[in-house]
């Protein structure tokens, strides 16, 4: 006994003259860009960060940022204050540079204070990255390195 299966149509029937187009890609992140934990990209290009409170269903909104790095650093700040030094971070080497000296570790801080600290770090990182980009844009490649103090 031979059982024959019909092949599932991969494309809907197309009338003559119709042009099939590919569906727009929802994922706007390029394949070579690293995905960070705790962040996502809005349709219009802003990056947002949020974190779930331990043992609760509620989330702490950490803000929206121009860059993925700023949103990820805001997330790192929040997760560090919520879970302590054992937390898995996007940028483990940067956490102490952000002024997270250890006060309020392990859930001692209120969600409002965590949100405030994370927003400060994210905004600072966004500002630093914007300043870096401006400096690169203003760099005159026709000048000699000595003109820049190099």
From Swiss-Prot:
One of its GO terms (cellular component) is nucleus. Keywords: Activator, DNA-binding, Ethylene signaling pathway, Nucleus, Transcription, Transcription regulation. Pfam families: AP2. It is found in: Nucleus. Its main location: nucleus. GO terms for biological process: ethylene-activated signaling pathway. Residues 35-92 bind DNA. SMART domains: AP2 (SM00380). The keyword Transcription regulation applies. PROSITE patterns: AP2_ERF. CDD domains: AP2. GO terms for molecular function: DNA binding; DNA-binding transcription factor activity. InterPro entries: AP2/ERF_dom, AP2/ERF_dom_sf, DNA-bd_dom_sf. Belongs to the AP2/ERF transcription factor family. ERF subfamily. Probably acts as a transcriptional activator. Binds to the GCC-box pathogenesis-related promoter element. May be involved in the regulation of gene expression by stress factors and by components of stress signal transduction pathways. This is Ethylene-responsive transcription factor RAP2-9.
């Amino acid at each position: 006994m031979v059982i024959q299966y019909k092949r599932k149509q991969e494309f809907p029937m197309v009338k003559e003259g119709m042009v099939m187009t590919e569906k727009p890609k929802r994922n706007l992140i390029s394949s070579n860009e690293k995905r960070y934990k705790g962040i996502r990209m809005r349709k219009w290009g802003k990056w947002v960060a949020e974190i779930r409170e331990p043992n609760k269903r509620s989330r702490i909104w950490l803000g929206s940022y121009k860059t993925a790095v700023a949103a990820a650093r805001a997330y790192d700040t929040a997760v560090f204050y919520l879970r302590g030094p054992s937390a898995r971070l996007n940028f483990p080497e940067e956490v102490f540079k952000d002024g997270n000296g250890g006060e309020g570790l392990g859930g001692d801080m209120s969600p409002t204070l965590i949100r405030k600290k994370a927003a400060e770090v994210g905004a600072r990182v966004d500002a630093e990255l914007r300043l870096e980009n401006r400096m690169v844009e203003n760099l005159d490649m026709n000048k000699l390195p000595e003109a820049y103090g190099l």
